[in-house]
């Protein structure tokens, strides 16, 4: 009975293991925006640093909500060149929801973690 249990466990583990090499480009999870979001590159943090400097607002960590001097990144550029997002942005890459982002300071965006 013990041998049957061990054999069944080993068989289940072998069936659950991935088979063969994965195909396609490798994408870090930090390089992906959710459905309906657009990717932006923000190359200046001076506005957010001034707004979140030593003050009452510094306790709120508004850097997660504010971004400055951002421009949209074309998904075609990233897919055609297979270049990670951290090679395209000097400071911070962000994902912004479906609201229009035209101003100097953009609200409602989520930073994309750049893994070194």
From Swiss-Prot:
Q: What outcome is recorded for mutants in which this gene has been deleted? A: Causes a failure to assemble morphologically irregular rodlets into orderly bundles. Retains distorted surface bundles, but leads to truncated/incomplete rodlets within the bundles; and displays both decreased cell surface hydrophobicity and adhesion, but the mutant is unaffected in virulence. Does not affect radial growth and multiple stress responses.
Keyword Secreted listed? The answer is yes
- GO molecular function, one example? structural constituent of cell wall
Q: Where is the signal peptide?
A: 1-16
Q: Keyword set for this entry? A: Cell wall, Cytoplasmic vesicle, Disulfide bond, Secreted, Signal, Vacuole
Its biological purpose: Aerial growth, conidiation, and dispersal of filamentous fungi in the environment rely upon a capability of their secreting small amphipathic proteins called hydrophobins (HPBs) with low sequence identity. Class I can self-assemble into an outermost layer of rodlet bundles on aerial cell surfaces, conferring cellular hydrophobicity that supports fungal growth, development and dispersal; whereas Class II form highly ordered films at water-air interfaces through intermolecular interactions but contribute nothing to the rodlet structure.
- Provide the protein name: Class I hydrophobin B
């Amino acid at each position: 009975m013990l041998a049957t249990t061990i054999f069944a466990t080993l068989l289940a583990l072998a069936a659950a293991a991935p088979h063969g090499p994965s195909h396609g480009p490798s994408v870090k999870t930090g390089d992906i925006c959710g459905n309906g979001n657009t990717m932006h590159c923000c190359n200046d943090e001076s506005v957010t640093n001034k707004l979140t400097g030593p003050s009452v607002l510094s306790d709120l960590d508004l850097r997660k909500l504010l971004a400055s001097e951002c421009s949209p990144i074309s998904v075609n550029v990233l897919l055609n060149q297979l270049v990670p997002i951290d090679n395209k942005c000097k400071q911070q890459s962000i994902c912004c929801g479906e609201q229009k982002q035209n101003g100097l300071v953009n609200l409602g965006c989520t930073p994309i973690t750049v893994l070194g």
